[in-house]
Amino acid sequence: MKRRILIISLSIVAIASIAAALFIAPFFLNKNEKDTIIYIYPDMTEVALEDSIKARLGEDFGKKTSFMLKVLDAKAYNRTGAYLIPNGLSPYKAARKLQYGGQTGVKFIFNNVRFVDNFAERVSKRLLMEKDDLLTLLKDSAFCAKYGKTPQTISTIFQPDSYEFYWTVKPEDFVDRMYHFYNKFWNEERLAKAKALGLTPDEVATLASIVEDETAKRDERGKVARLYLNRIKTRMKLQADPTVIYAIGDYSIRRVYSYTLKTDSPYNTYLHFGLPPGPIRFVEKSTLDAVLNAPSHNYIYMCAKENFSGYHNFATSYSEHKANARRYQKELNRRGIKR
């Protein structure tokens, strides 16, 4: 009888152990199927975090991860940040990562930005900072002065590219880190090239922003840059249409008429000699280099080609330029482009 009771007891223990193993195993053996970032927001509730985990990791894997967080009494909802759950991680290890793991870097990629307001909005959509908090700094003269900039030139620090930040980075630290990358770009060789042109890095960026708006053709940017450098050297007004459009603020314009050239603005290079107070867009590194390495030529006039290829006709004389301009205007009229 005792032997029978012992066998039954051992069987129950064995069955219980197997059942426990079958229950526990998925928490250690199931694997996350792809790299996934979990974002934990300030003041996030436990329920909200559970919902986010299930949404990003999948219902089943997410439930198991949330269960392990409860078992571990992790209180991960208090750990504001972005945490990478790598491909192949189990629910248990995913929970431990959310409990103790360090933040992962978040990619911030930007290009084709014109205004500081647009830039601040892009940043706020990717990183955990309010648009207005960053914008307030970038429009503050004292803050800009710390970097040797003004609110008109502060955009030169932010060069379109791919960067990595902690999601929780503060606005001041964000600008500091971007300034670090800016200084890496402006090495001794580039500074020497700018000096040889008689320009500061800010002036190079300002000229490059005009060049970038003048032509989308990267292989033409150096040639356009040299044309403007020739004008600066001979003390001619730049007379760059993009500066007039920037002053007007209407980017739907395709034709610049004589009355628009009278727009009262320090950015209007038809009215004022030299470069405007700052860039008219955030400038690509390749365009900065196009200015610094602009090939020599004697052109001082240019006009869009009448075939609408995006390239320009260049001229050394005003009469040649007028002939180029007439052909282009004739084609505008033929196509019915009035503004």
Question: At which residue positions do the language-model features occur?
Answer:
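Conserved catalytic or metal-liganding residues and their short signature motifs at active sites
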Residues: 1-239, 244-246, 281-286, 290-298, ...
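Conserved SxxK-family serine transpeptidase/carboxypeptidase catalytic domain
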Residues: 239-281, 286
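Short glycine/proline-rich, acidic loop/turn segments that cap or connect secondary-structure elements
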Residues: 259-265, 290-301
